[in-house]
């Protein structure tokens, strides 16, 4: 059972790394006013983040966990990092869902990316989307980066726990 869970863990790490990269690419594209490329990058980031969540929960269900086994004086810092990661990850899911909802509303009203600015309901929805992602993107990046750091820490100072 554990080797399968370990493979799932590696796949989960790969998906969240790729999700973070796709997120950054999406931010770049929207700053270049490349809406279609932005949309594709963000959908990719969202799908990869969803896949990560499924893999992560599967790994936990299989009983594969790691705990910090490093120097005792570093444990408080590790726990602060871990708790902030967990809290921000919990906040990120609803933030991302609301941002996606406004995207859906805007696209439904506009009919296509080219009509976003011409259809008032679409413009309002995308203005709301923009307001939400100003919070969502930094939280998402924080969660991704702290997740990678936690993974690296546990790779060096982690011990596998089984249930």
Where are these regions (language model features)?
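Alpha-helical membrane insertion/targeting regions
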Residues: 1-163
């Amino acid at each position: 059972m554990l080797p399968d869970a370990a493979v799932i863990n590696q796949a989960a790490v790969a998906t969240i790394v790729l999700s973070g990269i796709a997120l950054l690419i999406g931010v770049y594209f929207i700053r270049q006013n490349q809406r279609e490329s932005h949309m594709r990058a963000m959908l990719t980031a969202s799908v990869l983040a969803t896949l990560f969540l499924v893999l992560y929960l599967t790994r936990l269900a299989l009983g594969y966990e790691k705990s910090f086994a490093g120097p005792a004086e570093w444990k408080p810092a590790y726990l602060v990092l871990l708790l902030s990661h967990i809290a921000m990850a919990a906040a990120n899911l609803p933030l991302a869902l609301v941002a996606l909802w406004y995207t859906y509303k805007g696209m439904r009203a506009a009919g296509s990316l080219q009509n976003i600015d011409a259809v008032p309901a679409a413009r309002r929805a995308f203005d709301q989307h923009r307001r939400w992602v100003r919070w969502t993107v930094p939280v998402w990046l924080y969660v991704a980066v702290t997740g990678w750091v936690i993974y690296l820490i546990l790779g060096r100072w982690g011990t596998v726990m089984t249930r």
